Structure formats: C-alpha cells, structure tokens
C-alpha cells in the first residue's frame, strides 16, 4: 500500500428510536451519532463505514430524516465519504433510504461492486433474512482488473455471525465462499464490541452507539480500522452516553417498607439526576407497595426515566416458575405456513409479498403473473385432475320424513279440514269436510293459519293419500277466501228454525263461496280449474245449528245445481262486483272499509295468480 488508510467503523445507531416514549432519549441517539461523526472529522479519517441499522424504523419521521442529512452533510463538507449497508430494522421492499442519500451526494450504498478508498476495496451485503441464508448467491461480486496487487479488501455485513452468541450464519462459510480474500469483515447487528480472527481474516463488531435496552451495560463504542503495508489494526473508541443507574432495594418485612426503599434510593442521590433509573425491589412480599409513589419520589430527585420492578418472591413459589424460550421468527412463520396447509397458489402469494426483491408497487403484478403461470401449467384434461370442494356440514333434509311424520300422527288440527289437491291433477275434486268437533257459540276463537307445508311435502302427501294437509304458502296468502271461511264458521248466532231455513242458509253459503271464487277473473291472469267430475255439495247439519260443507253421498245432477244457483240469482255478482244485500249466514262486507290503494290497484291482488281452483280451497 502507498499510504496508511484509516476507516471509522460504526453500526446500529438506531436514529429516531423514542426509547421509553421519551423525546429526550430520541435526541440521545442523535447526539451519539453526532459524536461519532465529529470524531471522524476531527481525526480526518479516510472514510466512515456504517454496518446497518442507521434508522430504528423503515419509516423514519421527516424530522429524523432532516437531522440525519444535517449530520451527514458535515462529512461531505470535510470531504469524508460515508458508506453503508441496509440493516434489518430499516429494510424496505423497494428503494432504501441509503439510495436517497446517495442521490443527494451524502452517502454511498455498498454492494457487490467495490467502493474504493485509496488502495482499499470495500464490499457490502445487506441484511439477509435467516430463511434466505442457505440460498444466498455468492456470485456476482466484481473484481476490477484495475485493482492494485496489494489492494486490501473489506466486507461489510449486518448479521449475527458465528462464533458470536445466537448466530444466524457461519462466518467461516462466508469467508470461504467469497470470490476474493477478505482481510476483515466489519459487522453490525450485535450491539457489543467484539474482535476475533477467523482463519486469516479479522471479524469485528463495533457495537451500538447508544443503549437500546437495560441489558446493554457496557460502554458504547465505535472502531478505527487502520490498514497499511504492515498489516491491519483494529482499535476501539468509547462514546459518552446517558447514565443508566441500577438500584436494588431490599424490604425485610417491617411495617414501613417505603422508608426502607427511600433510604436505599437516597444513597444514590448524586447519580440520579438526568439518569435512567432501574429500581428492583426484593425481600419480603407481605407488604403492599404502590410503585407509582416510588416512581414519583425518584422523579422528584431528578431522574429522567424511572422503571420499578417487583423482584420479591412470594412464599411457597419457587424463583423459576416458567422457563421461557424464544424461537426464531422466521422459523415460527415457516411452521405457521405448514400448519395452514396452503396450496401452490397460496405459497406463491406468500413468497411474493414477503420477498424483499419485489417492490411494493409491483406486488399485485408479480402475484398475478406467477399465478397465471401456475394455472397455465395445469393440465385440466388429465383424468387424475381433481378439484376438492369442502363438504357442507349441514345435513340434507329428506322430504319423505315430513310426510311420514304427518302420516304417523293420529291427530289432525281442526283447521286441517280442507283436503289438498295437487295442481297437476285437474281431475281431482276439492272436498271440504265437516269439522269433527265444534265448539259452543260462546267459545268460538279466531282460526289461525298453521305453518304451511313445503311443496315437496304437499305433493308427497297427496300421492300417499294421507290425512288432510295444508297447501303451500301461496294459499295462506289468499285473504278473501280465508276471511270468508273463518267468518262462516264464527257465525253461530244464526240458527235455522226449520229444515227450510237451513236449506236457505246452505244456499246462501254456496252463493257466498261462489261469489268469492268469481272474483278471480281471467283479467287477473288466474287460470281456473276445469270442471271436476265430483262437484262440491252442501248438506244440512241441524244438530250443530248451522250449515256445514261436507262431501255428498250421491252426486247431484248439473240441473239441480243450476236450479239452486238460480234461486239466489239476485245475489250473484254483477259486472264483477258483489251485491250489497247481505246473504244469510255471511258477515256483512259492506261495512268493511277498503283501502284507497286497493281501489287504485297499487298493491298486489290478495289472490295469487296462475293457480287452479284447488289451490284456493
């Protein structure tokens, strides 16, 4: 080498970290970084190398970015280059913050192409997820022919490397697979200073510039790498940082535990101001302590941040209750993916979303292209090809079960006095049976429509000649027919005095039923049923006091039915309207108000359309 080269090695500055939710602690991290840069300018080093985690978050605030650019500009003024790699905390899917600083001339991003500082070539590898370490590609490193023969080569990485604690990567493996001989490997991610030799290469961690946790009790530092013709030297420089004070107060079971704790705290009054204080309370656990009072007392003594921990052990409980083991996050994700049993498409989507090589703006496009490629590769004509569809947990309903349950039941509701007629059987006759039991006139109740049977059960019941069964729901909506039948059976005050009177009542009932049916005109789109071979007949039931409708013992001739209908011709509908005269045994409908919307035809007809006469009975 022509001359001695000095490079400042730092890492894990974690700028923007608001530790313990304290703005003062956020400023402390910037002050530590400023100290490093100030020392670099004062020592006139040849370059500053940052080994990852410049920021604590991949989304630093605008204030953090402005302060960082302000600090880096001091190096630019001093003509000292700043080189860095991307750490795991700040890694983004697309453009990195180092790329922005490089465009501004404030920094350079290290990679497989070397950055030259005199006769020293510096390479870099960004933080690699643990799951991708076995697949890392060592090819692509550039070794320019213009490099001098005695050129020294440095590699900068952000990984936990073996032989450090909890390693992710074997440093010896990396050095062996590199296409060049590395004189030193400058590392980040481990926050303590380390320096070891692996083979012929030096491996060193500079440590973090500020304490990221209470466990980091050692002084913070950075390193100076000195390269010359005689060899390589690594020296450590510490950084002054805010004091972390650890106090242990023991309670021995007296009545005044607070006095014991405050007495112990008072022994450190000179160290408490502007310090981050950690107080552990140990000893007897019988007394109840208010930690808020202890924190307020320490803050009153000038502490910046106070953390109180109850380290007392309750009687009968061993000190080690549970052993906690922390698993690798990447391994946990892999186990969760195996548990989910994703298909090929799901695995492709997961891989694209979590890949750092796919920019966020191209996730949708890349996912679509990969899935289309998967679909095109599938041979749908393959006889072994099969699409699995989850089976519903709902048990199928057997239509015959409803019918069988009805047939097995010995009791039939009084309202089930109307025999069902299949719409597909025009030759069947609708027969209205006489109720088996009739209540006294004073005990008459309003007849409620039972829950209608389904169409399947309705058809099956007719085919099996079962007991009476209500038709489907469309019959329940027939307001006019239901109202007429209900009011006929409720009219108990009309009692015939003679068979002649009873006969007139039967005729009136027949007329009322015919009047209701005649409302269904061809204009409404209703298809009337053809003439049945077994017409409806009416019989007299003088024992019950009113006329009931029952199946005839003998079928009357059409002439008799015609004579009965002509007897009440004056009560037949004229021009589609009922007569205003009240038929015997039929409630007066003239007093019932009709809604205006019904007159104008704004609402649907009460009688369903396109059903035959059997549906209405």
From Swiss-Prot:
Signal peptide: none annotated. Its cofactor is Mn(2+). One of its GO terms (biological process) is double-strand break repair. Binds 2 manganese ions per subunit. InterPro entries: Calcineurin-like_PHP_ApaH, DNA_Repair-Maintenance_Comp, Metallo-depent_PP-like, Mre11_archaea-type, Mre11_N. Its EC number is 3.1.-.-. Residues 395-432, 549-559 have a biased composition (Low complexity). CDD domains: MPP_Mre11_N. Mn(2+) 2 binds at residues 53, 88, 158, 189. Residues 560-583 have a biased composition (Basic and acidic residues). The active site is at residue 89. Residues 529-547 have a biased composition (Polar residues). Mn(2+) 1 binds at residues 12, 14, 53, 191. Disulfide bonds: none annotated. Keywords: DNA damage, DNA repair, Endonuclease, Exonuclease, Hydrolase, Manganese, Metal-binding, Nuclease. Nuclease activity is regulated by Rad50. Coiled coil: none annotated. Homodimer. Forms a heterotetramer composed of two Mre11 subunits and two Rad50 subunits. Part of the Rad50/Mre11 complex, which is involved in the early steps of DNA double-strand break (DSB) repair. The complex may facilitate opening of the processed DNA ends to aid in the recruitment of HerA and NurA. Mre11 binds to DSB ends and has both double-stranded 3'-5' exonuclease activity and single-stranded endonuclease activity. Belongs to the MRE11/RAD32 family. This is DNA double-strand break repair protein Mre11. The lineage of its organism: Archaea, Methanobacteriati, Methanobacteriota, Stenosarchaea group, Methanomicrobia. The gene is mre11.
